[in-house]
């Protein structure tokens, strides 16, 4: 518990110390984030990693209490 308290205190000092030297809060917060991290970059990386819904539906089988549903029913001729 004491460690968490001191971590919190040090974080507050780390953020507020530049403010006491005349810095602006927005500049201090921006200084905590790397320059190459932008909302657009984060969104693009999330979209590129997400598989399409059809791939997820065809590959993921959800099991409850170790009871899995049978694979999707297919017609004998191999269509649909």
From Swiss-Prot:
Annotated propeptide span(s): 23-57, 74-80
Record key words, sorted: Cleavage on pair of basic residues, D-amino acid, Disulfide bond, G-protein coupled receptor impairing toxin, Hydroxylation, Secreted, Signal, Toxin
Superkingdom of the organism of origin: Eukaryota
GO molecular function list: toxin activity
Residues where D-tryptophan is found: 65
Endpoints of the signal sequence: 1-22
Free-text tissue specificity from the UniProt record: Expressed by the venom duct.
Miscellaneous remark of the record: This peptide is an evolutionarily optimized stable analog of somatostatin. In addition, it adopts nearly identical conformations as in the somatostatin drug analog Octreotide. As this drug, it contains a D-Trp at the same position, whose synthesis is a common strategy used for enhancing the metabolic stability of compounds in drug design.
Role of this protein: Moderately activates human somatostatin receptors (SSTR) with a preferential activation of SSTR1 and SSTR4. In vivo, does not cause behavioral changes in mice within a few minutes of intracranial injection, but causes a progressive loss of movement thereafter. Four to five hours after injection, mice recover, even with the highest dose tested. Shows antinociception and antihyperalgesia activities in two mouse models of acute pain, most probably by acting outside the central nervous system.
Family under the similarity heading: Belongs to the conotoxin C superfamily. Consomatin family.
Name under which the protein is recorded: Consomatin Mrc1
Phylogenetic placement of the source organism: Eukaryota, Metazoa, Spiralia, Lophotrochozoa, Mollusca
């Amino acid at each position: 518990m004491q460690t968490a308290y001191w971590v919190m205190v040090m974080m507050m000092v780390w953020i507020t110390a530049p403010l006491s030297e005349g810095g602006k809060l927005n500049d201090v917060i921006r200084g905590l984030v790397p320059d190459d991290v932008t909302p657009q970059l984060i969104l693009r990386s999330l979209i590129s990693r997400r598989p399409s819904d059809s791939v997820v539906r065809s590959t993921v089988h959800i099991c409850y209490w170790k009871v899995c549903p049978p694979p999707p029913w297919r017609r004998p001729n191999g269509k649909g």
